[in-house]
Amino acid sequence: MSGKIPKYFITELLSRTNIIELINTRLELKKYGKNYQTNCPFHHDKTPSFTVSNEKQFYYCFGCNAHGNAIDFLIQYEHLSFIESIEELALIHGVKIPFENTVQNSIYVKKQKLYLLMEKICKLYKKNINVTHLANKYLARRGINQNMIDFFLIGFSSLKWNEFYKKINISKEFEQELLINNIIATDKNGYIYDRFQGRIIFPIQDNHGRIIGFGGRSLNDMSPKYLNSPETDIFYKRKQIYGLYQVIKKCSKPVYLLVVEGYIDVITLTQYNIDYAVSILGTSTTTEHIQLLFKNTDIIICCYDGDDAGKNAAWKTLKKALPYISDKKTLKFILLPNQEDPDTIIRKEGREKFQKRIDNAITMSKFFFKNILKNINLSSDDDKFHLSVHALPLINTISSDTIRIYLRQILARMIGILDDNQFEKFLYEKETKNTQKTYFQIKRTPMRTLIGLLVQNPSLAKLVPVTMKFKNLQIKGLSIFLEILQTCRDNPNIHTGQLLELYRNTTIINVLKILARWDHMIIQKETQNMFLDLLMNIHDKILEKRREYLIAKERKKGLQMNEKKEIWSINKKLSKR
């Protein structure tokens, strides 16, 4: 990726980024000595093993080996690509990325144009609703007040595309891009039209509040009733959640998120001060949705219609969520009466009664067994067998030992395992998959320790005298040390996170990452002394090797006068040690 985004820009971007602040917006960090700690988000972590260093701008988990700088964190935590993580940081700091690659730059420019165009179209939709009687009549009938219209930027599309074209002032070239991306379309006569014409518009925003797409609801019998924007370079339905931006804007870490099915449901619940309602965009729940929801809350409450379709949707959601459930993260369910949805029922019952439904939501374990026991006769041995075969693979996908064993315990009692030995074996039976990971390790040597100290403390480079000569490059690891030393000298204020970023995708990056997290078992104030001692010892080793070479040469063919002076100088230096 270094050929696409200049290294100087990435280094500058990391210098503007405080990794503590970045991670703290997503995880709750607590100060521990000079570092910060929390439970690792990348594995089931019972005690805090995720450490973040403000000094090094680097994180490391002692449990699962996750590590890196601010860019790596966004890649791992947000499931972004390298370039997407750079774009995220650039957006946070309000800077433009100077792509070197013309293709990548054109993609970036195209995305920025799309954001701007979506914003313009949204404003036009919003302006249009204020002067459209039909749209206002519909919203009034649905009981949606002006505050909600403004808060969710609700609009209406009744204009022909040529009116958009004139008001937004876009080029023909970009109009073609919109056609290619299916944002606009052509009819059988070749006329361009707005896909949302005649619909109430619900703008969809990303986590920064940027408009990335729209949902449209028809006011007549037009099919389909609901229509979403086609996917583009900035809009992916399987990754977006309607209303999440509004929730996070009010509360950065809500106690729970209530997942409902429609745009109107979210808006009505918010109007009734249920400020944590969100919606999947008219599609089935994906693993990306589950991960995004759990990043923002510890409790997901899914509210579905009580008919068969709603129950099936809830069951599918639970199966998708099982691998992400932990001791702290869980799922609950509300199944509404038939022919009811959150919008209709809260208007009938009021907020207080609806809140009771939330408070009494069905727990994950109860919902799991309620569904798994459908059509099962527990007095039948065959049914017990089928129950076990069906339930165990699902239970085994749960990463939490506590929850997994608890569900197995319930299952064991159901199928009649009462013998203590059999029961114990059933509960703690090893998983078929090997969960142990093997990590790349390297042996400790003085040279690697020296490099490790420099990687962790780049400012130590100033302690190495410029006059100190390193002529013998055959000493293992010396070339790497000299390479890192020069990089630190060229970038006087560089920190560990920036240093590692400069070596991303190089042959030595894996070694450098290991050295960056080595514990040298010394107090901080002794770091400088240890570094200098190792430096002098290695320099002495270089001098000794050079002296051995010159002595061997003298025996074979003699030395030049300058080489004899060099031996004398080496002997003098070594005698002072």
Curated annotation (Swiss-Prot):
Residues reported to bind Mg(2+) 2: D305, D307
Alphabetical GO biological process terms: DNA replication, synthesis of primer
Domain of life the protein comes from: Bacteria
Cofactor(s) of this protein: Zn(2+); Mg(2+)
Record-annotated Toprim domain positions: 255-337
Record text on cofactor binding: Binds 1 zinc ion per monomer.
Annotated zinc fingers (CHC2-type), start-end: 40-64
Positions of Mg(2+) 1 binding: E261, D305
UniProt-listed Pfam families: DnaB_bind (PF10410), DnaG_DnaB_bind (PF08278), DNAG_N (PF08275), Toprim_2 (PF13155), Zn_ribbon_DnaG (PF01807)
Record EC number: 2.7.7.101
UniProt keyword annotations, A-Z: DNA replication, DNA-binding, DNA-directed RNA polymerase, Magnesium, Metal-binding, Nucleotidyltransferase, Primosome, Transcription, Transferase, Zinc, Zinc-finger
Any one GO CC term of the record: cytoplasm
Catalysed transformations (reactions): ssDNA + n NTP = ssDNA/pppN(pN)n-1 hybrid + (n-1) diphosphate
Enzyme kind, highest EC tier: transferase
GO molecular function, one term: DNA-directed RNA polymerase activity
InterPro entries assigned: DNA_helicase_N/primase_C, DNA_primase_core_N_sf, DNA_primase_DnaB-bd, DNA_primase_DnaG, DNA_primase_DnaG_DnaB-bd_dom, DNA_primase_Znf_CHC2, DnaG_bac, DNAG_N
The record's note on its domains: Contains an N-terminal zinc-binding domain, a central core domain that contains the primase activity, and a C-terminal DnaB-binding domain.
Stated role: RNA polymerase that catalyzes the synthesis of short RNA molecules used as primers for DNA polymerase during DNA replication.
Family: Belongs to the DnaG primase family.
Subunit structure: Monomer. Interacts with DnaB.
HAMAP family: DNA_primase_DnaG
Entry protein name: DNA primase
Organism: Buchnera aphidicola subsp. Acyrthosiphon pisum (strain APS)
